[in-house]
Amino acid sequence: MALTVKEKKNVEVVVPQPRQKHVIQGEPTVAYETRDLNLWYGKDHALKNINLSIYEKEVTAIIGPSGCGKSTYLKTLNRMVELVPSVRISGNISYRGRNILDKSFQVEELRTRVGMVFQKPNPFPKSIFDNVAYGPRIHGIRNKKILSEIVERSLRGAAIWDEVKDRLHENAYGLSGGQQQRLCIARCLAIEPDVILMDEPTSALDPKSTLKIEELIQELKKEYSIIIVTHNMQQAARISDKTAFFLNGEVVEYDSTDIIFSNPSDKRTEDYITGRFG
């Protein structure tokens, strides 16, 4: 539901309120359905016939050795991969029943529904408050009270509010690496996405900060669908519900994380997770 706020000059701004989250009963709901997805960088065939169903309110881990297509696949889910001039894509990626590769699907709409957290924390050279308020402002929200509510809610959602509530107007660069990454997660939450993509979100962090992010992911999956690329096998086993193993641009195996790590059906999966290669 939206709240209409009258600002100066009697201009009405429609402020998005947190969308009601529904408990999924019975069969899980599909967030993304990827069918026969192929992707080329020039002549390099980077993704080959990818078929995956990714479910809502779960953590899905994408694992595999460097260069296997993990991050490329992740970036197809919000069409960031299209920023590469030589890229060519075929197949279908359905998000909640709509093909996001259809040119009629507006990228701006997609990216308000699908947030992304990158490998290295990338706060803007602004205050902590302005980092989180940036997205809502882009979408037309100017009312200070509403912005303050969004900022607090997002920082609480990213489990960093208590650490920064007295320094909201300090530069975000003054935060530690782990705090910066949680700030970036808060910035992502501020636009109320349905899906959060995470590309190696803890690889640049120390073990203590990594643990905080992992605990946060477990909380966030109650409200959001999370897809995480990771090289860390132990991390994938700890935090994910399902795991897809990529190799040479193909999905070798996709199943519940318990099965992937305890009883994989493909020897290549077993060899990878036990460290025989990769």
From Swiss-Prot:
Keywords: ATP-binding, Cell membrane, Membrane, Nucleotide-binding, Phosphate transport, Translocase, Transport. Its EC number is 7.3.2.1. GO terms for molecular function: ATP binding; ATP hydrolysis activity; ATPase-coupled phosphate ion transmembrane transporter activity. The keyword Translocase applies. It comes from the Bacteria. It is a peripheral membrane protein. It is an enzyme of class 7 (translocase). Residues 32-273 form the ABC transporter domain. Its main location: membrane. It catalyses: phosphate(out) + ATP + H2O = ADP + 2 phosphate(in) + H(+). ATP binds at G64, P65, S66, G67, C68, G69, K70, S71. InterPro entries: AAA+_ATPase (IPR003593), ABC_transporter-like_ATP-bd (IPR003439), ABC_transporter-like_CS (IPR017871), P-loop_NTPase (IPR027417), PstB-like (IPR005670). One of its GO terms (cellular component) is plasma membrane. It is found in: Cell membrane. GO terms for biological process: phosphate ion transmembrane transport. Pfam families: ABC_tran (PF00005). SMART domains: AAA. Part of the ABC transporter complex PstSACB involved in phosphate import. Responsible for energy coupling to the transport system. The complex is composed of two ATP-binding proteins (PstB), two transmembrane proteins (PstC and PstA) and a solute-binding protein (PstS). Belongs to the ABC transporter superfamily. Phosphate importer (TC 3.A.1.7) family. This is Phosphate import ATP-binding protein PstB. The gene is pstB.
